[in-house]
Amino acid sequence: MSLSRMPKPASAEGAPPETRYEFKPFRYSSHFWILKALDHERAPVKILDVGTAAGYLGKIWTARGHHVTGIEFDAATAEKARGYYESFQVTDLETFAFPYRREFDYIVFADVLEHLRDPAAALRRCMPALKESGKIVISVPNVANWVVRLSLLLGKFDYMDRGILDRTHLRFFTLRSLEKMMEEVSCDVVEVTPTPLPMQLVFPFTESKFFAPFHEALYAITCGWKTLLAYQFVITAGPRDSWQFPVLSEEMMPSRKLTKQ
């Protein structure tokens, strides 16, 4: 079985986003590290969750007392998610103007940027929403993973229903290209965390505590050769001191207040 796809009894092609992209709560997953990036926040903070899916992360952050705003493209998925957020907007991320000014402590793009035609443009548009001391947390798949490299060596670049070569991915990232994009949007990457191959999804029986040493070893090896072995990268970045907010025209500003609907 290819480790680049997530096994399911039936094809996930055309499935709703909430079933295509399930919550990965297990240790060392991208969701594990995204949640951990905010674990030190004891007082409530303001979070903008961009691309909420079914609200997995928003539900946890809200339960912890944080103030969370959600943005989602898919209307059906949004209906499942909006109850976990103080405010919510269903919109196209390719054009959304982010009508906030220095409002959020964190902006999170969890498995989102690879689905956009121009992820750098989306990042630039969201930057005015971030407080001067705020952070952006991003997770993207690593197209330079050894599984994809081996497939290329064999003359294959086959899209899958899930995984690194998900059919819905429009952009592909290596660690270098991800860091370059953050530089282009005037952000400094302050932390990079690789995630190992999600063996718990490929082989569910490895969720047993018996396999904990195996997952510890797999993560340690992944950290040692992250550009080759990482399944995903989770980065934390902050705006540079010299970053200037762009001036938005009236046409770019949304016409209504963003509230839970």
Question: What are these model-predicted stretches?
Answer:
Residues 117-121, 148:
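Short N-terminal helix/helix-N-cap motif within the alpha/beta-hydrolase-1
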Residues 121-135:
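A short glycine-rich, Lys/Arg-flanked "PGG" loop and its adjoining helix->strand segment in the class I
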Residues 138-160:
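Conserved class I S-adenosyl-L-methionine
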Residues 1-108, 120-123, 194-207, 213-220, ...:
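Conserved N-terminal segment of class I S-adenosyl-L-methionine
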Residues 176-193:
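A SAM-dependent methyltransferase catalytic signature shared across enzymes that methylate proteins
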Residues 160-177:
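Acceptor-substrate binding/catalytic loop of class I
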Residues 110-115:
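Short catalytic micro-motifs in class I SAM-dependent methyltransferases
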